[in-house]
Amino acid sequence: MFKENTIKLGIAPIAWTNDDMPELGAENTFEQCISEMALAGFNGSEVGNKYPRNTVVLKKSLELRNLEIASAWFSAFLTTKPLEETVQAFIKHRDFLHDMGAKVIVVSEQGHSIQGLMDVPLFKNKPVFTEEEWEKLADGLHHLGKLAQEKGLHIVYHHHMGTGVQTTAEIEKLMDMTDPELVSLLFDTGHLVFSGEEPLYILKKYLSRIKHVHLKDIRQEVVDAVKESDLSFLQAVKNGAFTVPGDGVIVFDEVFTILANSDYKGWFVVEAEQDPALANPFEYALKARKFIQEKAGL
């Protein structure tokens, strides 16, 4: 289905230890995490809180297991803080990823975000940017995009639950306001379906701008309960809203077909944060790997 040597398969460490709720999977070590990733058949990963920031140490640990770094999340605060604060943190992040050989930087605007707040209802309190904030976001992303390109990297914007860029209309507005040469898109199946969007619409419309893919599935009954009970994003994660591809309600066949018939070249990263005490990370990594092999031939 996919052309040879176009796709690398990664998996996110958030299934082993949750970055937002470090008590979930606190017992899982960095070495266990990356060893199980390799054993499950993945080529690389994104970066978690337990990963060493010393690139010499990190490279050695990964090379022993034939793993690479695909990318790492960056929290921008372009709508709420002075640009220089985000820029300083971004340059450090960019240089780390460049040293690790990554080609994309995952960026998410966290100004007004409620994704990390345990008791704030996800759907009732979703932030909405003002026009002035949209302008700050677009201008700031252009700045970050230029900084990334100085080192041969691209920024990929992560639409995300509980943030100001979550819905179809918000993704479209961001894409309309930004330069395709400077700002690319991260396509995340799980966040789109969770929000009630149509992922194939976004995939088809912005195919040429998508430079990174997160594969995650949704347990619809949990999403329904989140809406009915006014739960937060973190409560949704703890209750199992997300799972690995093939374990929920999302149909991935057309997603894979569209991407296979496109010029997409890069990473598919399985990112399915759930409580590792309830969903053994190694077991679910194996499930995901088997599903991708069966459905995408990868």
From Swiss-Prot:
EC no. given is: 4.2.1.44
Q: What is this protein called?
A: Inosose dehydratase 2
One of the GO biological process terms: inositol catabolic process
**Catalyzed reactions:** scyllo-inosose = 3D-3,5/4-trihydroxycyclohexane-1,2-dione + H2O
Q: Which gene encodes it?
A: iolE2
Query: SUPFAM superfamilies under this entry?
Result: Xylose isomerase-like (SSF51658)
Q: So which residues are the signal peptide here?
A: none
Q: Which cofactor does it need?
A: glutathione; Co(2+); Mn(2+)
Member of which family? Belongs to the IolE/MocC family.
Query: What metabolic or biological pathway is this protein involved in?
Result: Polyol metabolism; myo-inositol degradation into acetyl-CoA; acetyl-CoA from myo-inositol: step 2/7
HAMAP family (alphabetical): IolE
Q: Name one GO molecular function term.
A: manganese ion binding
For the keyword Manganese, the answer is yes
Q: Which residues form a coiled coil?
A: none
Query: Main EC class of this protein?
Result: lyase
Q: What Gene3D superfamilies is this protein classified in?
A: Divalent-metal-dependent TIM barrel enzymes
